[in-house]
């Protein structure tokens, strides 16, 4: 039986090889996974042209996935450096990578990225439009925007971020409800500017059926971008954000009718007390589609530490329904991240994702923690290092401050609770004062 997309196959009762791979990774029955894909509750982004892909599922009941952003810019046009970042993301087992390149001719980098990457690849075609055509933004036609999107999927992008919900109605709501930070989405601001400069409707909204044609042809997932995500805590959960989310819910159903998979993108900056509500609103308005969030960043006062502010928000968001976390690095709001920034951002986001999986009861999530607890009780340092989310750092810290006793560290020495409880329960002397063990 033939099928066009993962969703089309699922609706027809066909188990694809991608479904089989994802089900095995998630320790779940493939028929259960197929049912979730058929209903849009799980997306498996898998472009037919991405030959090196090791597919992952995003959505209900699955492990929380993370995305790494990278790409070339006008001030940092170094393809080799960005390819080093790609390898770093792959080595650290990020499930997805987004190419946010926004200057010049980006196709060479994009092709090399897709060819070398087993991770899911996402792109934002509007970032590429000015460089692709060597034209000012206002002079690009609606048809040309669609052609850029098609070029990206021909190259093998598994999902496209398109800010389709920034239509005239959303723009009108934005104008009537002033914000402290206006629109902080790069793609959203470009589309809003194009609409204002040309007095026209969002080309991706106006020609949404043509966009769906492209996605269906290549089995590309639509990541419906949040142009009105809050850029500061003062702007969170406002009229513009909710108006756009309503539009995204309507667009989701249109995409599903065409068997195109959908991911919904979300905030942004917001205080801790608003996160759970926002997750529930998205799941309600967007019919249970997978939710992809940036952070949320829970305070605006921590430049240089936004990997922490976002990990706090991300853990809460994923606990209450977010399925996909975009990493944030210490360089956020300051500069393009380097390799060290990347590492910190990936680790912080992976911690948030795993913490949420524990809270959600994702199958197998506790196994890792239970193994670490056993290694700690056994004072098996080598095993602890192997299980650490950052093995290199754990080893380095231990090496930098060595205890005299092999079964303790320099925090407690022979007063180590674990050491002493082990000895007492085994009927051994604590041997607190003598240097020998």
UniProtKB/Swiss-Prot annotation:
Substrates-to-products reaction catalysed: 5-amino-1-(5-phospho-beta-D-ribosyl)imidazole + S-adenosyl-L-methionine = 4-amino-2-methyl-5-(phosphooxymethyl)pyrimidine + CO + 5'-deoxyadenosine + formate + L-methionine + 3 H(+)
Cofactor: [4Fe-4S] cluster
Cofactor note: Binds 1 [4Fe-4S] cluster per subunit. The cluster is coordinated with 3 cysteines and an exchangeable S-adenosyl-L-methionine.
UniProt: substrate binding residues: 69, 98, 127, 163, 185-187, 226-229, 265, 292
Pathway entry: Cofactor biosynthesis; thiamine diphosphate biosynthesis
Cited Pfam families: ThiC_Rad_SAM (PF01964)
EC numbers: 4.1.99.17
A GO MF label: 4 iron, 4 sulfur cluster binding
GO cellular component terms, A-Z: cytosol
Residues where [4Fe-4S] cluster binds: 409, 412, 416
A GO biological-process term: thiamine diphosphate biosynthetic process
Binding site for Zn(2+): 269, 333
Signal peptide: none
Keywords on record: 4Fe-4S, Iron, Iron-sulfur, Lyase, Metal-binding, S-adenosyl-L-methionine, Thiamine biosynthesis, Zinc
The UniProt record lists the keyword 4Fe-4S: yes
PANTHER family, per database record: PHOSPHOMETHYLPYRIMIDINE SYNTHASE, CHLOROPLASTIC, THIAMINE BIOSYNTHESIS PROTEIN THIC
Function as written in the Swiss-Prot or TrEMBL entry: Catalyzes the synthesis of the hydroxymethylpyrimidine phosphate (HMP-P) moiety of thiamine from aminoimidazole ribotide (AIR) in a radical S-adenosyl-L-methionine (SAM)-dependent reaction.
Record family assignment: Belongs to the ThiC family.
HAMAP family per record: ThiC (MF_00089)
Protein name, entry field: Phosphomethylpyrimidine synthase
Upper classification of the organism: Bacteria, Bacillati, Bacillota, Clostridia, Eubacteriales
Gene: thiC
